[in-house]
Amino acid sequence: MANKKIRIRLKAYEHRTLDTAAEKIVETATRTGATVAGPVPLPTERSLYTIIRATHKYKDSREQFEMRTHKRLIDIVNPTQKTVDALMKLDLPSGVNVKIKL
């Protein structure tokens, strides 16, 4: 292939789902003969939301909700056409956001 590296960035709210998706990608790429670097765990993005429990008053009574976004990075070095075809046909778990950069 003309490009020597494929960079795959994965995002998910559940780290177990993310790790299984990364494991499937790494196993598929190594099976087709490409060199794999990763998965590299990137920093977890944490969003915290604070709301008032009551509808009208009692401002001191609040509730906090947290949302964590886990991220992984996988580099596939020297991919073959067979590697690209296998990655296109790969079925990943739902809830995993995949960004591919060539």
Curated annotation (Swiss-Prot):
A GO CC term attached to the entry: ribosome
Entry function: Involved in the binding of tRNA to the ribosomes.
SUPFAM superfamilies with a match to the protein in the record: Ribosomal protein S10
Keyword Methyltransferase part of the UniProt annotation: no
Gene3D superfamilies tied to this protein: Ribosomal protein S10 domain (3.30.70.600)
Gene (name only): rpsJ
Entry similarity comment: Belongs to the universal ribosomal protein uS10 family.
Any one GO biological process: translation
Assembly and interaction partners: Part of the 30S ribosomal subunit.
Lineage, top ranks: Bacteria, Bacillati, Bacillota, Bacilli, Lactobacillales
Pfam families for this protein: Ribosomal_S10
Protein name: Small ribosomal subunit protein uS10
Keywords: Ribonucleoprotein, Ribosomal protein
GO molecular function: structural constituent of ribosome; tRNA binding
Record-linked InterPro entries: Ribosomal_uS10 (IPR001848), Ribosomal_uS10_CS (IPR018268), Ribosomal_uS10_dom (IPR027486), Ribosomal_uS10_dom_sf (IPR036838)
